[in-house]
UniProtKB/Swiss-Prot annotation:
The lineage of its organism: Eukaryota, Metazoa, Chordata, Craniata, Vertebrata. This is Dermaseptin-DA2. Possesses a potent antimicrobial activity against Gram-positive and Gram-negative bacteria. Probably acts by disturbing membrane functions with its amphipathic structure. One of its GO terms (biological process) is defense response to bacterium. The keyword Heme does not apply. Belongs to the frog skin active peptide (FSAP) family. Dermaseptin subfamily. InterPro entries: Dermaseptin_dom (IPR022731), Frog_antimicrobial_propeptide (IPR004275), FSAP (IPR016322). Pfam families: DD_K (PF12121), FSAP_sig_propep (PF03032).
Length: 75
């Protein structure tokens, strides 16, 4: 009976150790994923800002070109 208790205790102990190692690993992976998500959000925000500025400049250039063409046709 004592042998069974010791064996059961050993199995439970090893299971808990294994579980805690897995939990630490999972936490590390979650932290890495969170860092990757934050970096991708920052990149996305930079691209969004850049595209807005490029769109604004391109829109102004097209508007000026159309205005110039309209003015030339009126003369």
């Amino acid at each position: 009976m004592a042998l069974v208790k010791k064996s059961l205790f050993l199995v439970l102990f090893l299971g808990l150790v294994s579980l805690s190692i897995c939990e630490e690993k999972r936490e590390n992976e979650d932290e890495e994923e969170q860092e990757d998500d934050e970096q991708s959000e920052e990149k996305r925000a930079l691209w969004k800002t850049l595209l807005k500025k490029v769109g604004k400049v391109a829109g102004k250039a097209v508007l000026n070109a159309v205005t110039n063409m309209a003015n030339q046709n009126e003369q």
